[in-house]
Amino acid sequence: MVSFSSILLACSAAIGALATPIEPLADHPNEAFNETAFNDLVGRSTPSSTGYNNGYYYSFWTDGGGDVTYTNGNGGSYSVQWSNVGNFVGGKGWNPGSSRAITYSGSFNPSGNGYLAVYGWTTDPLIEYYIVESYGTYNPGSGGTYKGQVTSDGGTYNIYTSVRTNAPSIIGTATFTQFWSVRTSKRVGGTVTTGNHFNAWAKYGLTLGTHNYQIVATEGYQSSGSSAITVY
């Protein structure tokens, strides 16, 4: 894909996360199986999961590449450390999502490709959306169609849309639309009034459906870094 959004979520429909198939060991009959090395490799990363922690919904998904550790903290806090990952996304928030003002604080330090965003899904229609507060070396808007701008919470966001065809989603492999608001001046911390973005998207014909989950997410793609975020 052009951006990270291929990340998303279908490791199983139940947890709303994607999975990338792993090449079976049987395809390499001449390679000796080292169980200790294999267990060390798998054990480096936190497994994909979803659920509730200290009153907040959380979602964490990884394709298993590289080393990524996701840790739920007190209240709405979580942290992620990653090194030479394939792809992951995780964070805390709510299920279902809604048009709410989300306040968050913390740190976000990607080395390479990474996003810090309010992230969520809707169904009927199936939409994957990002309100991007900060990013690393790749501006996700560069892969979409520019629609306009919205001014909210002391900043200007460029609005983009893109279509994913036969891609993983919260309901399995599907074709769906992505909505993006990308802040022109990066920040880590503040309030995101999601309703302002939802209304602006609707103005440009980008209509959300019934909300599924909504989190303040850290995402990494073929990169390293660290993040520590608290959602209020």
Curated annotation (Swiss-Prot):
UniProt main location, coarse: secreted
pH dependence: Optimum pH is 6.0. Retains over 95 percent activity in the pH range from 5.0 to 7.0, and 70 percent activity in the pH range from 4.0 to 8.0.
Active site per UniProt: 128, 219
Superkingdom of source: Eukaryota
Alphabetical GO biological process terms: xylan catabolic process
Gene3D superfamilies, sorted: 2.60.120.180
Keywords on record: Carbohydrate metabolism, Glycoprotein, Glycosidase, Hydrolase, Polysaccharide degradation, Secreted, Signal, Xylan degradation
EC annotation from Swiss-Prot or TrEMBL: 3.2.1.8
An example Gene Ontology molecular-function term: endo-1,4-beta-xylanase activity
Temperature remarks: Optimum temperature is 58 degrees Celsius. Has complete stability at 60 degrees Celsius.
Pathway assigned in UniProt: Glycan degradation; xylan degradation
Signal peptide: 1-19
An annotated GO cellular component: extracellular region
The reaction(s) this protein catalyses: Endohydrolysis of (1->4)-beta-D-xylosidic linkages in xylans
SUPFAM superfamilies: Concanavalin A-like lectins/glucanases (SSF49899)
Subcellular location per the Swiss-Prot or TrEMBL entry: Secreted
Keyword hit for Metal-binding: no
Domain GH11: 44-232
Alphabetized InterPro entries for the sequence: ConA-like_dom_sf, GH11/12, GH11_AS_1, GH11_AS_2, GH11_dom, Glyco_hydro_11
Residues carrying sugar: 34
UniProt miscellaneous comment: The promoter contains two 5'-GGCTAAA-3' sequences identified as binding sites for the xylanolytic transcriptional activator xlnR.
PANTHER family listed in its UniProt record: ENDO-1,4-BETA-XYLANASE A-RELATED
Role played: Endo-1,4-beta-xylanase involved in the hydrolysis of xylan, a major structural heterogeneous polysaccharide found in plant biomass representing the second most abundant polysaccharide in the biosphere, after cellulose.
Assigned protein family: Belongs to the glycosyl hydrolase 11 (cellulase G) family.
Name listed for the protein in its UniProt record: Endo-1,4-beta-xylanase A
Organism: Aspergillus oryzae (strain ATCC 42149 / RIB 40)
